[in-house]
Amino acid sequence: TQALLDIFTMREKKGSIKGLKVAIVGDILHSRVARSNIWGLLKLGAEVTVGGPAPLVPKEFEAVGVKVCHNLKDAVQDADVINLLRIQHERLNAAYFPSIGEYSKFFGLNQEAMKFVRPDALIMHPGPINRGVELDSAVADGPNSVILEQVTNGLAVRMAVLFLVAGQVKHVY
């Protein structure tokens, strides 16, 4: 349901998904959120870019029309929407990247990195946020952030999904 609410939020804020440029940054390799978003966004006509450390961003995504980047600037500079994924601390033990500090330095969205971002780009995150890792507080709480709207929309979208899977309901109060 995360991809449904992410796409709902994008559509609510940007209008049509068709032609929208969406960057997904982080651990693409292990993320169901990334894969679901990629599938849904491509089906709806968006242009998708994925970015992150090379071991966490499989080149195989290029085969389905996704642009693959291994530096933050290239991933986000043309994006209408930037969706940052949570880095799971257990990935540190698997040596996908040297340290949390190293990840944050090269792939964390902070005030300095925001210089490369379009002024009207939306900043999204499925949560929970590791502040200071995927993005800093100034960005998470800044004017481009729609993270709280994602949370709000998540409740409505998930209620709608439950309503639909529950089958025929005779009375809605």
Where are these regions (language model features)?
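Catalytic cores of large soluble enzymes that bind and process phosphate-bearing ligands
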Residues: 2, 102, 106, 153
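Adenosine-phosphate binding glycine-rich loop
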Residues: 120-173
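Rossmann-like adenosine-cofactor binding region
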Residues: 61-138
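Catalytic-loop motifs flanking and including active-site residues across diverse enzymes
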Residues: 2, 33, 157-158
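A glycine-rich, Thr/Ser-enriched phosphate-binding loop motif common to dinucleotide/cofactor-binding enzymes
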Residues: 1-9
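Glycine-rich phosphate/diphosphate-binding loop of Rossmann-like nucleotide-binding domains
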Residues: 11-85
